Amino acid sequence: MIDSRFRLLLVLAAAALGPSASALQLPKVFTDGAVLQRDRAVPVWGSAAAGKQVVVKFAGQEKSTRAAADGKWRIDLDALPASAEGRVLEVREEGGAKLEVKDLLVGEVWLASGQSNMEWPISRSRPEDQAIAASGPVPLLRVLTVPKKLSAYRLDDFDGRWQAATPDSVRHFSAVAYFFGRRLTEELGIPVGMIHSSWGGSRIEPWLADEGLAGIPDLREMRDFRKARSPGTAEYDHLMRRHLKATRAWIDAAARALHERRPLPGQPSAPPQLPLGHGQALGTYQAMIHPLVPYGIRGFLWYQGESNLGEGMLYTLKMEALIKGWRQQFGVPAAPFLFVQLAPYHYGDNREGALPAIWVAQQHVLKLPHTGMAVTMDIGNPADIHPTHKSEVARRLALWALADTYGKPGIVKSGPLFEKMEIAGDAIRIRFSGAPTGLTTRDGKPPSHFEVAGPDWNFQPATAEIAAGEALVTLRSDAVKSPVMARFAWRQAAEPNLMNREGLPAAAFHSHWPDDPVLGRNLALQRPFTASDPNPSGWNSGLTDGSWHGAAGTCFATGAAPGFPKHVTIDLGRAREVHTARFGVPEFGATRTVVLSLSEDGKQFQEIGKHEFPGKSKAATELRWDKRPARFIRASFPDHHGKLDQYDENHAFLTELEVYGPTQ
């Protein structure tokens, strides 16, 4: 018979754990000093005893609901106008339990996230910025930091509290978030709440709400992969149930084997999970963003990308997923999403094209509605990945918010952005947007960091001339008599001098990357590939990276095993209609004939053309055919030249392989 005292303890423990006895609670985003979002419904939520009535009172409103079986409840207050009057939010549970949150303001709320440059505190910013923050409190500004934490599951709460923006409270707060919020209070004259949730060194993947991956065909594989490895999803639960069934069968089989003194059978492996970590695939959204959902906010700030360097246009797709997912989770489908383009920095001699590719990928995010990009080409430090001029970064983000979100007239929000290119004989004309009153340079010298090239993609420095009163630059180069393409600031440490007359810098561009003006999008860009003779030294990264640089170690190379033919096969991810391929070889190596073939299933390949390259010459060619569906494109190397330089003739080299299909 169970001891009565033990029975009592069991009853008390069950009551304490059960939702029916849950104490009335609010998440930490509702603490004294909070700012509520104006001009839209205000969600208030928490937990209480199951079935109990919950009443919320604020600013003359009183609304009620009942807690669900799991104790959760939510009430949406009617939209409120901005107010700097500190008022009390009262939440009462049927039976007498009551909570009060004091000194609540109503205004604008923004969520700032990313990696170290967003996390970078005022205390480590430039002295001028520190002096501004130390000069006194900002009465209309409140700040909240979500502490660093990881979780494989979506959490409901976090440890943190709102604070008034005083010199002491903001010293270790995000400098970008602080100066952005401060700027809004000055321009709007209403309360502003800045929520900061970032982690230095984090990749974009752990910040994703997986709902954002839906509807992006090129991320379908990523979506399916994550679903099958994320605890709590239907796909993972199905795999786990199957694993448990197999484990039970194994236990029975193991017991029989033990009884019969036979070797135990192999134990079933548990379904794999996404790796947890701020630099991995999972964890920061679940613990640092989701606990804020569905708090009323106006928009998002984002400063990240260094940890995803090398992904090129794949980063654009991940940004799209991030933006869609956050907007969906917070219930704000048109919320502004403002982000910072990375500053120049020397990441290494073998990564010269990686940062320009991310710059272009970030600029392509502007095609999504209600987005904005602050360019930082002129305020970085090529020797320091953490430039300290954070107040100017924040000012440039605020220009987008003030112009687009708040409709302030007369604001030029962006610097010059590439608009179109025109060929004019021996010259190329580049027209920019973002320069309504014309172009200039910050040092009074001719525009720097422009290059032009012919069909061989061999870029040479170009002289640049600004057309008076126009957003137009004319480029020429004595080394390229018939230019067909141009690029600007296509170096990781580039600090060009071109800007608009409002002082905002021009963004880097490439007229033919990632989209060819005639052929459209390169379908092979960033796609995976496999080689029949893999290079053991890692010279296999350059085939689909979008760079025609062709330097040793950065282009594609097979191994040097004797015996030809060899081949490399690109997987486009799904069957696509294709009609053109562009490929080339570096000036070194013994690559001779390259044969291209297509396949829908990866087994049966059909040859569509070939090209023979001369030795010791950087060269590129283009093959065209009647459009046909293909998922796999293979480059085969049936032969080679004799040994021409220091490289073994059994290596096969390619600088790049691009694939094009009909434009959508």
Question: In which residue ranges do the predicted regions lie?
Answer:
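Bacterial N-terminal signal peptides that target proteins for export
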Residues: 1-9
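Cell-envelope and extracellular/periplasmic
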Residues: 22-519
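Low-complexity, Pro/Thr/Ser/Gly/Ala-rich linker/spacer regions in secreted
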Residues: 512-526, 661-664
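Predominantly extracellular/luminal regions of secreted and cell-surface proteins
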Residues: 519-549
